[in-house]
Amino acid sequence: FPVWGWVLMAVLLIGGFIAYKAVKGDKKSAWTTKKLSMGAICIALSSVLSMIRLWKMPMGGSITPASMLPLMLFAYVYGTGSGCTLGVIYGVLQFILDGGDAAAYGVTALLLDYPIAFAMMGLAGAFRSMKNENVGLALGVVLACFGRYLASFVSGWVFYGSYASYYGFVSPVVYSICYNGAYMLPECIICVLLAMLMGNRLVKSLKQNAK
């Protein structure tokens, strides 16, 4: 799937959200053209990075070269609410690109695995008021990763718990904790390290483009 296709779909989805807010008269959304463009770019970057899988789990989930970081950077610059919105849109796109397999487990599983899980990327903006941007971003990354982990844990426990015995686990809870932790922990570490090393420069670049 070409990069321009991801950008186009992102723009269409964000545009639809803006139109919906405009009809409702919600002036707080403030999705400017620059913000829309930056959101589309971040979604495209995350989508491309998500295709580079360093390790793929058998039942979904993978370790990538920080595919969530562009979404987290957007949340850190534009705020938690905007970050959550972008995460939901990205989650819908990921569901489409993954072929819609999660739909076989029901709507709730689909929501937990995609829109809700990636909406947690918005939590990366929780510490944006800190003076030290590297630390603030790193803390936000940890919180966002934990939020996504919780969504995946609940989904794995409730909807995929029947696979526990297949992988040698007695308890579906322990199975979900271990399974989702196996890819989320390394993914989080990669994102935190990059945030600590390059976060300050990346945030400044995004803020300059946002002006």
Regions found by a protein language model. Give the residues of each.
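Loop-helix junctions at membrane interfaces
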Residues: 1-211
